Amino acid sequence: MEAVYTPEQMRYIDAHSGVDVAVLIRRAGYAVAQTALRMLGGSYGKHVIVLAGKGNNGEDGRVASDFLRARGVKVSVFSSSEMPTQLPECDLVIDAVYGTGLRSDFVAPTTKAPVLAVDIPSGIDATTGECRGVPLRANETITFGG
């Protein structure tokens, strides 16, 4: 893994960007939704599961879920506190649990669906690149900043 910015540098950039955090989250959520639609190949009859953490990464996922619903996608959102060990069948999983804010080990739920990670797959330490627990294996990762 080659770091472009450390998590601390990204927090500094976000805090000093001059853009309200709600605007940044809305922009990120829209970009996540657009990437998800591309990965799905459309919206008709599709089911997406969003795994949403407590912080801004989780908010990115929740905002993406609103955009996807507006496009007709069936969306199920699981908060980090109610995440099952085995995910129901779906067409895509959006991993918005931790992002760069991982502080402890993470055991990902199992899924056969492709995974879109927001910032970095949950369970991977953004500073060291090391696995912390059992991370989700992302098919694609979308990140923002710089």
Q: What do the PLM-derived regions correspond to, one by one?
A:
Residues 1-45:
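Positively charged, low-complexity intrinsically disordered leader regions
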Residues 1-5, 41-146:
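Glycine-rich phosphate/dinucleotide-binding loop and adjoining beta-alpha-beta core of small-molecule
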